[in-house]
Protein backbone atom coordinates (compact mmCIF):
# COMPACT_ATOMS: atom_id res chain seq x y z
CA UNK A 1 0.00 0.00 0.00
CA UNK A 2 2.82 2.41 0.89
CA UNK A 3 4.29 2.16 -2.62
CA UNK A 4 0.97 2.74 -4.40
CA UNK A 5 -0.56 5.51 -2.25
CA UNK A 6 1.36 8.65 -1.39
CA UNK A 7 1.79 9.81 2.21
CA UNK A 8 -0.53 12.79 1.90
CA UNK A 9 -3.44 10.60 0.78
CA UNK A 10 -2.71 8.15 3.60
CA UNK A 11 -2.85 10.95 6.17
CA UNK A 12 -6.03 12.46 4.69
CA UNK A 13 -7.83 9.11 4.67
CA UNK A 14 -6.73 8.45 8.24
CA UNK A 15 -8.15 11.80 9.35
CA UNK A 16 -11.42 11.06 7.54
CA UNK A 17 -11.58 7.62 9.16
CA UNK A 18 -11.02 9.10 12.63
CA UNK A 19 -13.85 11.57 12.08
CA UNK A 20 -16.10 9.00 10.39
CA UNK A 21 -15.85 6.50 13.25
CA UNK A 22 -15.64 9.11 16.05
CA UNK A 23 -12.14 8.21 17.26
CA UNK A 24 -11.05 11.74 18.17
CA UNK A 25 -10.65 10.78 21.82
CA UNK A 26 -8.18 8.04 20.86
CA UNK A 27 -6.26 9.51 17.91
CA UNK A 28 -4.84 13.02 17.85
CA UNK A 29 -5.23 14.11 14.22
CA UNK A 30 -2.89 17.10 14.67
CA UNK A 31 0.08 14.73 15.14
CA UNK A 32 -0.60 12.65 12.02
CA UNK A 33 1.52 14.92 9.83
CA UNK A 34 4.65 14.03 11.82
CA UNK A 35 4.21 10.27 11.34
CA UNK A 36 6.03 8.37 8.62
CA UNK A 37 4.31 6.11 6.10
CA UNK A 38 4.80 2.93 8.12
CA UNK A 39 3.32 4.50 11.24
CA UNK A 40 0.28 5.80 9.31
CA UNK A 41 -0.37 2.38 7.79
CA UNK A 42 -0.06 0.82 11.25
CA UNK A 43 -2.56 3.35 12.60
CA UNK A 44 -5.01 2.53 9.80
CA UNK A 45 -4.72 -1.17 10.61
CA UNK A 46 -5.41 -0.49 14.28
CA UNK A 47 -8.51 1.53 13.36
CA UNK A 48 -9.87 -1.51 11.51
CA UNK A 49 -8.88 -4.05 14.18
CA UNK A 50 -10.41 -2.04 17.04
CA UNK A 51 -13.92 -2.08 15.58
CA UNK A 52 -16.61 -3.62 17.78
CA UNK A 53 -17.84 -6.38 15.48
CA UNK A 54 -17.39 -7.91 12.07
CA UNK A 55 -19.94 -5.59 10.50
CA UNK A 56 -18.06 -2.51 11.74
CA UNK A 57 -14.78 -3.96 10.48
CA UNK A 58 -16.23 -4.45 6.99
CA UNK A 59 -17.63 -0.94 7.07
CA UNK A 60 -14.19 0.47 7.95
CA UNK A 61 -12.54 -1.57 5.19
CA UNK A 62 -15.02 -0.34 2.60
CA UNK A 63 -14.58 3.25 3.71
CA UNK A 64 -10.78 3.13 3.55
CA UNK A 65 -10.81 1.28 0.22
CA UNK A 66 -13.03 3.92 -1.36
CA UNK A 67 -10.84 6.68 0.09
CA UNK A 68 -7.45 5.20 -0.83
CA UNK A 69 -8.35 3.71 -4.22
CA UNK A 70 -11.16 5.76 -5.73
CA UNK A 71 -12.21 5.09 -9.30
CA UNK A 72 -10.87 7.65 -11.79
CA UNK A 73 -14.34 8.39 -13.18
CA UNK A 74 -17.91 7.56 -12.28
CA UNK A 75 -18.78 4.31 -14.15
CA UNK A 76 -22.02 3.00 -15.59
CA UNK A 77 -23.09 6.23 -17.28
CA UNK A 78 -25.59 5.53 -20.07
CA UNK A 79 -26.13 8.08 -22.86
CA UNK A 80 -29.39 9.97 -22.66
CA UNK A 81 -30.69 8.29 -25.84
CA UNK A 82 -30.37 4.84 -24.26
CA UNK A 83 -31.89 6.09 -21.03
CA UNK A 84 -34.87 7.44 -22.97
CA UNK A 85 -35.45 4.11 -24.73
CA UNK A 86 -35.30 2.16 -21.48
CA UNK A 87 -37.59 4.69 -19.79
CA UNK A 88 -40.22 4.21 -22.51
CA UNK A 89 -39.96 0.41 -22.33
CA UNK A 90 -40.25 0.31 -18.55
CA UNK A 91 -42.90 3.04 -18.48
CA UNK A 92 -45.24 1.13 -20.79
CA UNK A 93 -44.74 -2.07 -18.83
CA UNK A 94 -45.43 -0.43 -15.47
CA UNK A 95 -48.50 1.40 -16.82
CA UNK A 96 -50.07 -1.81 -18.13
CA UNK A 97 -49.18 -3.69 -14.92
CA UNK A 98 -50.61 -1.05 -12.57
CA UNK A 99 -53.73 -0.41 -14.68
CA UNK A 100 -54.40 -4.10 -15.39
CA UNK A 101 -54.02 -5.28 -11.81
CA UNK A 102 -56.02 -2.29 -10.60
CA UNK A 103 -58.90 -3.34 -12.87
CA UNK A 104 -58.69 -6.93 -11.60
CA UNK A 105 -58.84 -5.56 -8.06
CA UNK A 106 -61.98 -3.59 -8.94
CA UNK A 107 -63.63 -6.51 -10.75
CA UNK A 108 -63.31 -8.96 -7.86
CA UNK A 109 -64.05 -6.57 -5.00
CA UNK A 110 -66.82 -4.65 -6.76
CA UNK A 111 -68.92 -7.55 -8.03
CA UNK A 112 -70.36 -10.18 -5.71
CA UNK A 113 -70.63 -12.78 -8.46
CA UNK A 114 -66.84 -12.61 -8.96
CA UNK A 115 -66.01 -13.36 -5.31
CA UNK A 116 -65.30 -17.03 -5.81
CA UNK A 117 -62.57 -19.01 -4.07
CA UNK A 118 -60.35 -19.02 -7.14
CA UNK A 119 -60.87 -15.31 -7.75
CA UNK A 120 -59.80 -14.55 -4.17
CA UNK A 121 -56.45 -16.13 -5.00
CA UNK A 122 -56.26 -14.12 -8.22
CA UNK A 123 -57.09 -11.00 -6.21
CA UNK A 124 -54.18 -11.70 -3.87
CA UNK A 125 -51.90 -12.26 -6.85
CA UNK A 126 -52.96 -8.92 -8.33
CA UNK A 127 -52.34 -7.12 -5.03
CA UNK A 128 -48.80 -8.51 -4.90
CA UNK A 129 -48.16 -7.55 -8.53
CA UNK A 130 -49.61 -4.08 -7.94
CA UNK A 131 -47.32 -3.48 -4.94
CA UNK A 132 -44.33 -4.79 -6.86
CA UNK A 133 -45.00 -2.51 -9.83
CA UNK A 134 -45.69 0.65 -7.82
CA UNK A 135 -43.44 0.38 -4.74
CA UNK A 136 -40.49 -1.60 -6.08
CA UNK A 137 -40.16 -1.61 -9.87
CA UNK A 138 -40.33 2.17 -10.31
CA UNK A 139 -37.60 2.93 -7.77
CA UNK A 140 -35.36 0.01 -8.76
CA UNK A 141 -35.52 1.07 -12.39
CA UNK A 142 -34.39 4.62 -11.54
CA UNK A 143 -31.57 3.17 -9.44
CA UNK A 144 -30.40 0.83 -12.22
CA UNK A 145 -30.76 3.43 -14.96
CA UNK A 146 -28.66 6.07 -13.20
CA UNK A 147 -26.55 3.76 -11.00
CA UNK A 148 -27.47 6.01 -8.11
CA UNK A 149 -29.91 5.64 -5.21
CA UNK A 150 -31.44 9.05 -4.40
CA UNK A 151 -34.25 7.83 -2.11
CA UNK A 152 -32.40 7.55 1.20
CA UNK A 153 -31.63 4.78 3.65
CA UNK A 154 -35.19 4.21 4.91
CA UNK A 155 -36.67 3.56 1.51
CA UNK A 156 -33.68 1.41 0.61
CA UNK A 157 -34.81 -0.90 3.42
CA UNK A 158 -38.47 -0.70 2.35
CA UNK A 159 -37.59 -1.35 -1.29
CA UNK A 160 -35.58 -4.49 -0.58
CA UNK A 161 -38.24 -5.77 1.80
CA UNK A 162 -41.16 -5.16 -0.58
CA UNK A 163 -39.29 -6.81 -3.45
CA UNK A 164 -38.89 -10.11 -1.62
CA UNK A 165 -42.33 -10.02 0.00
CA UNK A 166 -44.23 -9.48 -3.26
CA UNK A 167 -42.30 -12.13 -5.20
CA UNK A 168 -42.74 -14.67 -2.39
CA UNK A 169 -46.44 -13.87 -2.08
CA UNK A 170 -46.98 -14.27 -5.82
CA UNK A 171 -45.37 -17.69 -6.06
CA UNK A 172 -46.95 -18.98 -2.83
CA UNK A 173 -50.35 -17.88 -4.14
CA UNK A 174 -49.75 -19.81 -7.36
CA UNK A 175 -48.90 -22.89 -5.29
CA UNK A 176 -52.10 -22.46 -3.25
CA UNK A 177 -54.12 -22.21 -6.47
CA UNK A 178 -52.56 -25.40 -7.80
CA UNK A 179 -53.47 -27.26 -4.59
CA UNK A 180 -57.04 -25.93 -4.70
CA UNK A 181 -57.48 -26.96 -8.35
CA UNK A 182 -55.86 -30.34 -7.65
CA UNK A 183 -58.35 -31.14 -4.89
CA UNK A 184 -61.31 -29.97 -6.98
CA UNK A 185 -60.35 -32.06 -10.02
CA UNK A 186 -58.45 -35.11 -8.78
CA UNK A 187 -60.42 -35.51 -5.54
CA UNK A 188 -63.86 -34.02 -6.33
CA UNK A 189 -65.57 -35.74 -3.39
CA UNK A 190 -63.42 -33.95 -0.84
CA UNK A 191 -64.76 -30.84 0.81
CA UNK A 192 -64.01 -27.72 -1.19
CA UNK A 193 -62.05 -24.80 0.22
CA UNK A 194 -64.36 -22.28 1.90
CA UNK A 195 -63.98 -18.53 1.67
CA UNK A 196 -63.07 -18.33 5.33
CA UNK A 197 -60.32 -20.90 4.82
CA UNK A 198 -59.06 -18.97 1.80
CA UNK A 199 -58.69 -15.83 3.91
CA UNK A 200 -56.67 -17.77 6.48
CA UNK A 201 -54.44 -19.20 3.74
CA UNK A 202 -53.81 -15.74 2.30
CA UNK A 203 -52.86 -14.35 5.72
CA UNK A 204 -50.42 -17.22 6.21
CA UNK A 205 -48.93 -16.57 2.76
CA UNK A 206 -48.23 -12.93 3.59
CA UNK A 207 -46.87 -13.85 7.02
CA UNK A 208 -44.47 -16.44 5.57
CA UNK A 209 -43.34 -13.97 2.92
CA UNK A 210 -42.59 -11.35 5.58
CA UNK A 211 -40.56 -13.87 7.59
CA UNK A 212 -38.46 -14.78 4.55
CA UNK A 213 -37.89 -11.09 3.82
CA UNK A 214 -37.02 -10.09 7.40
CA UNK A 215 -33.22 -9.98 6.77
CA UNK A 216 -33.84 -7.09 4.37
CA UNK A 217 -35.09 -5.04 7.31
CA UNK A 218 -31.96 -5.82 9.31
CA UNK A 219 -29.12 -5.54 6.80
CA UNK A 220 -30.20 -3.07 4.10
CA UNK A 221 -27.86 -0.10 3.88
CA UNK A 222 -26.61 2.63 1.56
CA UNK A 223 -23.07 3.76 0.76
CA UNK A 224 -21.70 6.72 -1.19
CA UNK A 225 -18.74 6.18 -3.52
CA UNK A 226 -16.49 9.10 -4.51
CA UNK A 227 -14.35 9.48 -7.64
CA UNK A 228 -11.32 11.50 -8.73
CA UNK A 229 -13.39 13.68 -11.05
CA UNK A 230 -15.42 14.93 -8.09
CA UNK A 231 -18.54 12.92 -8.87
CA UNK A 232 -20.13 10.39 -6.55
CA UNK A 233 -22.93 7.86 -6.49
CA UNK A 234 -24.97 6.22 -3.74
CA UNK A 235 -25.79 2.51 -3.82
CA UNK A 236 -28.45 0.53 -1.96
CA UNK A 237 -27.26 -2.94 -0.96
CA UNK A 238 -27.29 -5.59 1.77
CA UNK A 239 -24.46 -5.25 4.30
CA UNK A 240 -24.22 -8.64 6.03
CA UNK A 241 -22.08 -9.39 9.10
CA UNK A 242 -19.41 -10.91 6.83
CA UNK A 243 -19.48 -8.15 4.23
CA UNK A 244 -21.47 -7.53 1.06
CA UNK A 245 -21.81 -8.83 -2.46
CA UNK A 246 -19.80 -10.39 -4.01
CA UNK A 247 -17.55 -11.49 -1.12
CA UNK A 248 -20.24 -12.19 1.50
CA UNK A 249 -21.14 -15.86 1.93
CA UNK A 250 -24.20 -14.88 3.97
CA UNK A 251 -25.51 -12.86 1.04
CA UNK A 252 -24.93 -15.78 -1.32
CA UNK A 253 -26.62 -18.26 1.05
CA UNK A 254 -29.65 -16.00 1.57
CA UNK A 255 -30.20 -15.44 -2.14
CA UNK A 256 -29.79 -19.16 -2.77
CA UNK A 257 -32.44 -19.94 -0.13
CA UNK A 258 -34.80 -17.39 -1.69
CA UNK A 259 -34.20 -18.95 -5.11
CA UNK A 260 -34.99 -22.46 -3.87
CA UNK A 261 -38.05 -21.51 -1.79
CA UNK A 262 -39.62 -19.06 -4.24
CA UNK A 263 -38.73 -20.69 -7.54
CA UNK A 264 -37.20 -24.17 -7.46
CA UNK A 265 -39.50 -26.03 -5.07
CA UNK A 266 -42.73 -24.20 -6.11
CA UNK A 267 -42.10 -24.95 -9.79
CA UNK A 268 -41.61 -28.66 -9.05
CA UNK A 269 -44.75 -28.80 -6.87
CA UNK A 270 -46.89 -27.02 -9.46
CA UNK A 271 -45.51 -29.19 -12.26
CA UNK A 272 -46.60 -32.32 -10.37
CA UNK A 273 -50.05 -30.91 -9.51
CA UNK A 274 -50.88 -29.78 -13.04
CA UNK A 275 -49.54 -33.01 -14.52
CA UNK A 276 -51.93 -35.02 -12.35
CA UNK A 277 -54.79 -32.67 -13.23
CA UNK A 278 -53.98 -32.97 -16.92
CA UNK A 279 -54.09 -36.75 -16.71
CA UNK A 280 -57.60 -36.56 -15.25
CA UNK A 281 -58.92 -33.85 -17.59
CA UNK A 282 -57.29 -34.91 -20.86
CA UNK A 283 -56.61 -38.57 -20.11
CA UNK A 284 -58.87 -41.57 -20.55
CA UNK A 285 -62.61 -40.96 -20.62
CA UNK A 286 -64.67 -41.97 -17.61
CA UNK A 287 -68.03 -43.73 -17.69
CA UNK A 288 -70.82 -41.33 -18.53
CA UNK A 289 -68.54 -38.53 -19.64
CA UNK A 290 -70.55 -38.06 -22.82
CA UNK A 291 -73.59 -36.82 -20.93
CA UNK A 292 -74.37 -33.13 -21.31
CA UNK A 293 -73.82 -32.38 -17.65
CA UNK A 294 -70.47 -34.13 -17.39
CA UNK A 295 -69.20 -32.75 -20.69
CA UNK A 296 -70.10 -29.22 -19.60
CA UNK A 297 -68.40 -29.64 -16.22
CA UNK A 298 -65.28 -31.14 -17.81
CA UNK A 299 -65.08 -28.35 -20.38
CA UNK A 300 -65.32 -25.70 -17.67
CA UNK A 301 -62.60 -27.33 -15.58
CA UNK A 302 -60.30 -27.62 -18.57
CA UNK A 303 -60.65 -23.91 -19.30
CA UNK A 304 -59.77 -22.95 -15.74
CA UNK A 305 -56.77 -25.30 -15.56
CA UNK A 306 -55.55 -24.15 -18.98
CA UNK A 307 -55.56 -20.55 -17.75
CA UNK A 308 -53.53 -21.38 -14.63
CA UNK A 309 -51.05 -23.46 -16.62
CA UNK A 310 -50.49 -20.37 -18.78
CA UNK A 311 -50.00 -18.17 -15.67
CA UNK A 312 -47.47 -20.56 -14.11
CA UNK A 313 -45.61 -21.04 -17.41
CA UNK A 314 -45.29 -17.28 -17.94
CA UNK A 315 -44.05 -16.85 -14.36
CA UNK A 316 -41.36 -19.50 -14.88
CA UNK A 317 -40.24 -18.01 -18.20
CA UNK A 318 -40.12 -14.43 -16.90
CA UNK A 319 -38.09 -15.16 -13.77
CA UNK A 320 -35.71 -17.88 -15.00
CA UNK A 321 -33.21 -15.58 -16.85
CA UNK A 322 -33.10 -13.21 -13.86
CA UNK A 323 -32.19 -16.01 -11.44
CA UNK A 324 -29.67 -17.58 -13.82
CA UNK A 325 -27.94 -14.22 -14.31
CA UNK A 326 -27.36 -13.75 -10.59
CA UNK A 327 -26.12 -17.30 -10.12
CA UNK A 328 -23.64 -16.74 -12.94
CA UNK A 329 -22.61 -13.32 -11.56
CA UNK A 330 -21.86 -14.79 -8.13
CA UNK A 331 -19.46 -17.32 -9.61
CA UNK A 332 -18.02 -14.97 -12.26
CA UNK A 333 -17.41 -11.58 -10.66
CA UNK A 334 -15.77 -10.19 -13.80
CA UNK A 335 -19.19 -10.00 -15.48
CA UNK A 336 -19.89 -6.86 -13.44
CA UNK A 337 -17.13 -5.00 -15.31
CA UNK A 338 -18.23 -5.94 -18.82
CA UNK A 339 -19.29 -3.23 -21.22
CA UNK A 340 -22.95 -4.16 -21.62
CA UNK A 341 -23.67 -5.46 -18.12
CA UNK A 342 -26.10 -2.65 -17.37
CA UNK A 343 -28.16 -3.40 -20.48
CA UNK A 344 -28.15 -7.10 -19.60
CA UNK A 345 -29.36 -6.44 -16.08
CA UNK A 346 -32.04 -4.00 -17.23
CA UNK A 347 -33.28 -6.54 -19.79
CA UNK A 348 -33.47 -9.41 -17.31
CA UNK A 349 -35.11 -7.19 -14.70
CA UNK A 350 -37.69 -5.94 -17.23
CA UNK A 351 -38.56 -9.53 -18.19
CA UNK A 352 -39.04 -10.50 -14.53
CA UNK A 353 -41.19 -7.47 -13.75
CA UNK A 354 -43.26 -7.93 -16.92
CA UNK A 355 -44.85 -10.96 -15.28
CA UNK A 356 -47.01 -8.50 -13.32
CA UNK A 357 -48.14 -7.01 -16.65
CA UNK A 358 -48.91 -10.34 -18.35
CA UNK A 359 -51.24 -11.81 -15.71
CA UNK A 360 -54.18 -9.41 -16.33
CA UNK A 361 -53.76 -9.99 -20.07
CA UNK A 362 -54.11 -13.75 -19.48
CA UNK A 363 -57.31 -13.19 -17.48
CA UNK A 364 -58.70 -11.11 -20.34
CA UNK A 365 -57.72 -13.66 -22.96
CA UNK A 366 -58.81 -16.88 -21.25
CA UNK A 367 -61.71 -15.95 -18.95
CA UNK A 368 -65.02 -14.76 -20.42
CA UNK A 369 -66.26 -13.08 -17.26
CA UNK A 370 -63.05 -11.13 -16.71
CA UNK A 371 -63.04 -10.23 -20.40
CA UNK A 372 -66.58 -8.82 -20.16
CA UNK A 373 -65.66 -6.48 -17.29
CA UNK A 374 -62.37 -5.50 -18.93
CA UNK A 375 -64.21 -4.59 -22.13
CA UNK A 376 -66.74 -2.53 -20.23
CA UNK A 377 -64.22 -0.38 -18.43
CA UNK A 378 -61.93 -0.06 -21.47
CA UNK A 379 -64.90 1.00 -23.60
CA UNK A 380 -65.97 3.44 -20.90
CA UNK A 381 -62.50 5.01 -20.78
CA UNK A 382 -62.12 5.19 -24.56
CA UNK A 383 -65.55 6.60 -25.34
CA UNK A 384 -65.62 8.84 -22.29
CA UNK A 385 -68.89 7.59 -20.87
CA UNK A 386 -68.12 8.57 -17.33
CA UNK A 387 -71.75 8.29 -16.29
CA UNK A 388 -71.93 4.66 -17.28
CA UNK A 389 -72.94 2.53 -14.33
CA UNK A 390 -72.58 -1.20 -13.96
CA UNK A 391 -75.66 -3.00 -12.74
CA UNK A 392 -75.54 -4.79 -9.45
CA UNK A 393 -76.50 -8.50 -9.29
CA UNK A 394 -79.89 -7.55 -7.82
CA UNK A 395 -80.69 -5.07 -10.60
CA UNK A 396 -79.61 -7.59 -13.22
CA UNK A 397 -82.00 -10.08 -11.65
CA UNK A 398 -84.82 -7.53 -11.84
CA UNK A 399 -84.06 -6.83 -15.49
CA UNK A 400 -84.06 -10.55 -16.17
CA UNK A 401 -87.49 -10.92 -14.58
CA UNK A 402 -88.84 -8.05 -16.68
CA UNK A 403 -87.58 -9.65 -19.86
CA UNK A 404 -89.34 -12.90 -18.97
CA UNK A 405 -92.79 -11.38 -18.29
CA UNK A 406 -94.00 -12.06 -21.80
CA UNK A 407 -92.99 -15.71 -21.53
CA UNK A 408 -94.76 -16.08 -18.19
CA UNK A 409 -97.96 -14.55 -19.58
CA UNK A 410 -98.05 -17.06 -22.41
CA UNK A 411 -97.58 -20.05 -20.13
CA UNK A 412 -100.25 -18.83 -17.66
CA UNK A 413 -103.15 -19.97 -19.84
CA UNK A 414 -101.56 -23.35 -20.35
CA UNK A 415 -101.33 -23.91 -16.61
CA UNK A 416 -104.99 -22.89 -16.20
CA UNK A 417 -106.09 -25.66 -18.55
CA UNK A 418 -103.90 -28.21 -16.86
CA UNK A 419 -105.62 -30.98 -14.87
CA UNK A 420 -102.53 -31.58 -12.84
CA UNK A 421 -102.93 -30.57 -9.20
CA UNK A 422 -99.93 -29.71 -7.09
CA UNK A 423 -99.55 -28.03 -3.78
CA UNK A 424 -97.52 -24.84 -3.35
CA UNK A 425 -94.27 -25.80 -1.78
CA UNK A 426 -90.58 -25.07 -1.93
CA UNK A 427 -89.00 -26.12 -5.21
CA UNK A 428 -85.93 -28.33 -4.95
CA UNK A 429 -82.52 -26.96 -5.79
CA UNK A 430 -81.23 -28.89 -8.77
CA UNK A 431 -77.76 -30.33 -8.79
CA UNK A 432 -76.32 -28.67 -11.87
CA UNK A 433 -76.01 -25.17 -13.29
CA UNK A 434 -77.49 -25.54 -16.76
CA UNK A 435 -78.53 -22.60 -18.92
CA UNK A 436 -82.19 -23.29 -18.09
CA UNK A 437 -83.68 -26.04 -15.91
CA UNK A 438 -87.19 -26.56 -14.54
CA UNK A 439 -88.30 -28.74 -11.67
CA UNK A 440 -91.80 -29.71 -10.77
CA UNK A 441 -93.20 -31.55 -7.81
CA UNK A 442 -96.55 -33.23 -8.26
CA UNK A 443 -99.21 -34.65 -5.97
CA UNK A 444 -102.22 -36.89 -6.60
CA UNK A 445 -105.37 -34.99 -7.63
CA UNK A 446 -107.64 -33.73 -4.90
CA UNK A 447 -105.05 -33.58 -2.19
CA UNK A 448 -105.71 -29.95 -1.28
CA UNK A 449 -107.89 -26.90 -1.91
CA UNK A 450 -105.08 -24.43 -2.55
CA UNK A 451 -103.78 -25.80 -5.81
CA UNK A 452 -100.93 -24.42 -7.90
CA UNK A 453 -98.21 -25.56 -10.20
CA UNK A 454 -94.64 -24.81 -9.28
CA UNK A 455 -91.97 -24.10 -11.87
CA UNK A 456 -88.35 -23.40 -10.86
CA UNK A 457 -86.49 -21.57 -13.61
CA UNK A 458 -82.76 -21.54 -12.90
CA UNK A 459 -81.52 -19.39 -15.71
CA UNK A 460 -77.95 -18.10 -15.79
CA UNK A 461 -77.30 -14.89 -17.79
CA UNK A 462 -74.39 -14.40 -20.15
CA UNK A 463 -72.03 -13.23 -17.41
CA UNK A 464 -73.18 -15.94 -15.00
CA UNK A 465 -73.61 -13.40 -12.24
CA UNK A 466 -77.33 -13.48 -11.34
CA UNK A 467 -78.87 -15.92 -8.91
CA UNK A 468 -81.68 -18.19 -10.20
CA UNK A 469 -85.31 -17.36 -9.41
CA UNK A 470 -88.11 -19.78 -8.69
CA UNK A 471 -91.68 -18.82 -9.62
CA UNK A 472 -95.03 -20.45 -8.80
CA UNK A 473 -98.12 -20.32 -10.98
CA UNK A 474 -101.45 -20.44 -9.13
CA UNK A 475 -104.13 -22.37 -11.01
CA UNK A 476 -107.07 -20.98 -9.03
CA UNK A 477 -106.47 -17.30 -9.66
CA UNK A 478 -104.15 -17.51 -12.65
CA UNK A 479 -101.35 -15.48 -11.04
CA UNK A 480 -97.69 -16.18 -10.52
CA UNK A 481 -96.21 -16.01 -7.05
CA UNK A 482 -92.63 -16.24 -5.89
CA UNK A 483 -91.72 -19.36 -4.00
CA UNK A 484 -89.17 -19.06 -1.21
CA UNK A 485 -86.20 -21.18 -2.18
CA UNK A 486 -82.50 -21.14 -1.55
CA UNK A 487 -80.69 -19.00 -4.07
CA UNK A 488 -77.72 -20.58 -5.71
CA UNK A 489 -74.96 -19.45 -8.02
CA UNK A 490 -72.37 -21.21 -10.16
CA UNK A 491 -68.77 -21.58 -9.10
CA UNK A 492 -65.79 -21.85 -11.44
CA UNK A 493 -66.41 -25.59 -11.88
CA UNK A 494 -69.99 -24.99 -13.03
CA UNK A 495 -71.41 -26.45 -9.81
CA UNK A 496 -74.21 -24.90 -7.70
CA UNK A 497 -73.18 -22.90 -4.66
CA UNK A 498 -75.69 -21.80 -2.04
CA UNK A 499 -75.67 -18.07 -1.37
CA UNK A 500 -76.51 -16.38 1.90
CA UNK A 501 -78.69 -13.24 1.88
CA UNK A 502 -75.53 -11.13 2.20
CA UNK A 503 -74.09 -12.71 -0.94
CA UNK A 504 -77.19 -12.28 -3.12
Curated annotation (Swiss-Prot):
Presence of keyword Glycoprotein: yes
GO CC terms of this entry: membrane; plasma membrane
Highest taxon of source: Eukaryota
Membrane topology: Multi-pass membrane protein
PROSITE patterns linked to this entry: G_PROTEIN_RECEP_F1_1, G_PROTEIN_RECEP_F1_2
Keyword Membrane: yes
Extracellular side: 1-84, 144-155, 225-250, 331-343
Expressing tissues: Expressed in central nervous system, as well as in subsets of neurons in each segment of the developing ventral ganglia.
SMART domains (UniProt xref): 7TM_GPCR_Srsx
Keywords: Cell membrane, G-protein coupled receptor, Glycoprotein, Membrane, Receptor, Transducer, Transmembrane, Transmembrane helix
SUPFAM superfamilies, per the entry: Family A G protein-coupled receptor-like
Disordered as annotated region, ranges: 393-450
GO function terms (MF aspect): neuropeptide receptor activity; tachykinin receptor activity
Biased composition (Polar residues): 395-404, 416-450
Glycosylation site residues: 12, 28, 36
Transmembrane annotation, as ranges: 85-108, 119-143, 156-179, 200-224, 251-275, 309-330, 344-367
Signal peptide, first to last residue: none
Cellular localisation: Cell membrane
Gene Ontology biological process: G protein-coupled receptor signaling pathway; inter-male aggressive behavior; neuropeptide signaling pathway; tachykinin receptor signaling pathway
Entry's family note: Belongs to the G-protein coupled receptor 1 family.
Name by which UniProt lists this protein: Tachykinin-like peptides receptor 86C
